Structure formats: structure tokens, C-alpha cells
Amino acid sequence: MRRPQSNKDKSNTPGKRKEYTKKPFSKGRVATSSKKTNPAPSDPDLIRLNRYVANAGVCSRREADTYITAGNVTVNGKTITEMGHKVKLTDIVKFDGRLLNPQKKEYVLLNKPKNFITTTSDERGRRTVMELVSKASKSRLVPVGRLDKNTTGLLLFTNDGDLAKKLTHPRHGIRKIYHVELNKNLSGEDLKKIQEGITLDDGPIKVDEVSYINNSPKREVGIEIHSGRNRIVRRIFEHLGYDVKKLDRVIFAGLTKKDLPRGHWR
């Protein structure tokens, strides 16, 4: 029985052996081999500098490229501005003079309570969300996006700069759902206005979805939105004459608060 001809066999032996003829070349023309050479194996101990910086939680890889070309990064005391430069994990890499440590990527989910601001530090001495996750990791974590002081609910922390950038950019359409409690019932007319889109001081805004919450008073509303504009949910309702009494983020990027009490993290 004849062995079936593989694709490799077909491409290399299409009926008869291919003959190669030597072509003449003159000065300035280099003879090239018809054989393909395998690329040298990459060194597993080397990583791109932009990835190193991103893994240290400073920023995304794209942003790291900008900082590198601007001269913000040094390797073993030498300023590196070359795109694609590679480093070893044992190299001494600094960003604006601060020593970086390429960490394992970590993610912490917090159910934020009220009266904490979303920032890594505050000059005015106000309580920050970092207090709540101080024991969650030894890595330098940063909050992904923000919740204002009086907003509760899901807040993600990570040292993964690329993921943080992706989750905060509106073009990626990251799903965020809020439970809103107003000072009075939301009228059907105003509900329709929100569904169709309204215009605020900083431009038009259209939510992904808004509806009354089942088996609850009409002053309680669920709203899904991917915009990251400052206080956007509160401003939508304030524009229509409502006061937001409670604002709770119940879903963020597919993550939920299930079995996560207020003020706790996992």
C-alpha cells in the first residue's frame, strides 16, 4: 500500500526533483542561499524593557515605550531610549530614579464602602482605598479606574499595567452595572430620556441600558454604562433633577460582589 503523500511531501516533490541553477552575480550583488535558516532561539531570561516596566505596575507597555524614548528609564545606571531593548530580571531598572521590581501579576477585588477616596495617596490626609487592601499583597497595586468617596461597590486593584489600561478605556466597552437609589421615583418620561441619551455640560452621553429594578420602588434603578467620565452616573440623574442617595457598582468587567461583604477583598 502506498503511503499517502503529506502536504510537506507535496510541496517538496511535485512529481520530480527541483533543480537549482547557479545564477551569475556581479559586484554589488550578493549571492543568497535558497535554504531558510532557523532564527536563533530567544533567551528566556531576557524580556523587553517596556514589558519589565509594565510588570512593575508603572503603566501599560505602550505608555512605557513613551517613557523609555523620553529618557525616564535607566538600566544598570545607563539611560535607555532604544525601542525593543531587552533586559534580564537581575538588571537594575529604575523609573525616574525609583527602583522597579518586575512582579508576578496580581489582582485584588474590593467591595468598597463609603467615605474612602480612590487614590494611592492623599496630601490632605483623607482615608484612601489603599488602607483597605494594604494586607492583600506585598506588590505595588493600583486601583483600576475610580469610585468617588460616597460610591460603594466593586473596585479592582492590580499591578498589571496593560490590563488596567484596557479596563479603563471606553473603546473596550467594559461592562459596568450600578444600582442607583434616588430621592424620588424616576418618571417614565425621564427613564426614556436616559435611554435615548442626554447632553451634559461636557457633551452627550448615552447609557448601554437603564431600567427599574424588579420588585423595588421606582426610585431604585439599574444602569449599565461603559463611559469613564467623572461622576457620570450621578450627573445623569442630577441633570434631570434627582438626588442620588446611594450608588453601588454591582458588576465590573464580569466580576460580581457575590459572597464579598462590604469593606472586604478577595
Task: Please report, for each region that a protein language model flagged, where it lies by residue.
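Basic, flexible Lys/Arg- and Gly-enriched helix-loop patches that mediate nucleic-acid binding at interfaces
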Residues: R2, G15-K18, A31-R266
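N-terminal acidic, proline/glycine-rich, low-complexity intrinsically disordered segments
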Residues: M1-K10
